[in-house]
Amino acid sequence: MFVECLPQYSSALDLISYAKWVAPGEGEGEILDFQIWPKRYNEYRNSGKPYVDFLYDHPALHGVDRQILLDCVPDGPPPGLPERYNLLAPHGISQGFHYPLAELMNKAEEQMGTYFLMHAPCHCYYSVPHWSASSVVEMAQAIKHADKFMTINSAPAVLASALRQNRLTYFLPQKEQWAQDNVAPWPGRVDVEL
């Protein structure tokens, strides 16, 4: 199986062995278009269905197991993190509902004690220990290996749904009209409120 996407998104395929990347327009054979933005965005919003339900309504996916399988994530902590740690993933790029960072940090300390704040690579300063992944694989590895994990509804939450089955994960969902975007619940996920 090949997945057609822009090069900047192709590193997500490093997490799996069963699909390979191909540049847009270079795919061959039957092509299934699951892209929602921008062409199907209004259809998605108007459906009222959760994101995953809307995606899996595609006829080619009927009866498919919805559990994400990430079979190429290394064991152990990634470079820069200790053997034991808790992790907060407070950032995302597609959230309609935004949580104040200071409140997320307070909630993380309340629920997990000491933690590392995961952020995008930058020359930035945080008042708590912080870490950034140099790749999508390192981000997934950090999420998988954390003792406790807290995340907003963003890419780290999707990774956690695959990598942290039955492991304590605090989840801060999208609210109000954006609740439709939330990742489907998984065993080990605990929804928290600020």
Regions found by a protein language model. Give the residues of each.
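Catalytic machinery of carbohydrate-active enzymes
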Residues: 1-194
